[in-house]
A protein has these predicted regions:
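N-terminal transmembrane-helix/juxtamembrane module of multi-pass inner/ER membrane proteins
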Residues: 1-2, 19, 23-113
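Aromatic-rich transmembrane-lumenal/periplasmic boundary elements in polytopic membrane proteins
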Residues: 34-38, 42-60, 136-174
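Hydrophobic core of alpha-helical transmembrane segments in multi-pass integral membrane proteins
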Residues: 2-16
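Membrane-interfacial catalytic/cofactor-binding modules of polytopic membrane enzymes
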Residues: 148-219
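Membrane-interface junctions at the ends of membrane-embedded or membrane-associated helices
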Residues: 219-226, 264-278
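Interfacial helix-loop-helix junctions of multi-pass membrane proteins
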Residues: 153-157, 200, 235-261
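Interfacial segments of alpha-helical transmembrane regions
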Residues: 25-27, 113-148, 154-165, 214
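Membrane-interfacial alpha-helical segments at the cytosolic side of multi-pass membrane proteins
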Residues: 114-121, 206-223, 256-265
């Protein structure tokens, strides 16, 4: 398991005096990787039942799109005349949107890590610590959500119907079009190693760049950095739905997860500021 290698690396870095400081500061990131990989040992579907149909129909009731053409009707998993957004985009997509979707999704983890490294290397250690521990906290909240409510993503219902099959492999869904377009098997490689396909709620894809944007604003980064992060964030939200990897409901809950995580992380400072201004 990858988590074993992370634990060994962390122990080695902590044992060596010259890298001990680095190990201390990057502890949240190591813990994130260890916890995520360790979820393979006890998957969420061993704790609670997997929901496939209820989330699909909730999405349809809130954001359903009328199906009219034969291609649209064939794409509807429950054979009605109402599509979820993921089904609509499975029929209606274009090369330019597919390319942008892949670029946005590739920013999901690398940009937050790059932002953390920037804060660390430029000695903005106060903000580095706050952002790093907030990142871990948001993930922990999200992981708890996975275990409370195991849920299948849209592509599962679109490809397999509404019966949960535990050994279902990861699926690139709409992101496969990016792999085909570029000739690179990036997303096939990433989703083939997915720790658990029944972990759609909340969408941590929606959370990471939102968290990064929030801390870019809080730490008063230049306006163009904030705008760039915000655009990537919005792009990832759109891609999550466009590619069939998440429902709009998942994305909204991912946003809520981020807000809760930031409020918990910054609660002491927010309370002190409120008392000061009262």
């Amino acid at each position: 398991m990858f988590s074993i290698y992370l634990i060994i690396l962390l122990a080695v870095l902590a044992a060596w005096k010259k890298t001990r400081r680095f190990a201390f500061y990057f502890l949240p990131w190591f813990l994130f990787g260890i916890i995520y990989d360790s979820m393979r040992l006890y998957p969420n579907y061993m704790v609670n039942d997997i929901d496939v149909a209820n989330l699909y129909h909730a999405e349809k009731s809130l954001f359903g799109i009328a199906a009219s053409s034969s291609a649209e009707l064939q794409a509807v998993a429950d054979h009605t005349q109402l599509m979820i957004p993921g089904e609509y985009f499975k029929v209606h997509h274009c090369g330019f949107a597919d390319f942008l979707a892949g670029i946005f999704y590739l920013c999901w983890v690398p940009v937050p890590i790059a932002f953390a490294l920037y804060l660390y290397l430029t000695k903005q250690l106060k903000w580095f610590r706050r952002f790093s521990w907030a990142f871990l906290l948001v993930n922990v909240i999200g992981f708890i959500g996975y275990y409370i409510y195991p849920a299948a993503p849209p592509w599962y219902a679109m490809n397999y119907g509404f019966k949960a099959v535990l050994n279902t492999p990861g699926n690139v869904a709409g992101l496969g079009r990016w792999d085909e377009m570029t000739g690179l098997q990036v997303f096939h490689g990433l989703y083939g190693k997915n720790a658990n396909v029944f972990a759609a709620v909340p969408s941590l894809h929606a959370a990471y760049m939102f968290l990064t944007t929030i801390y870019a604003v809080m730490s008063r980064k230049r306006w163009y950095t904030v705008v760039l992060f915000a655009c990537i964030c919005l792009g990832i939200w759109w891609t999550a739905v466009y590619s069939g990897h998440h429902y709009i409901i998942d994305v909204m809950l991912g946003i809520l997860t981020t807000i809760v995580g930031v409020l918990l992380m910054e609660s002491k400072r927010l309370w002190a500021r409120l008392k000061k201004n009262s």
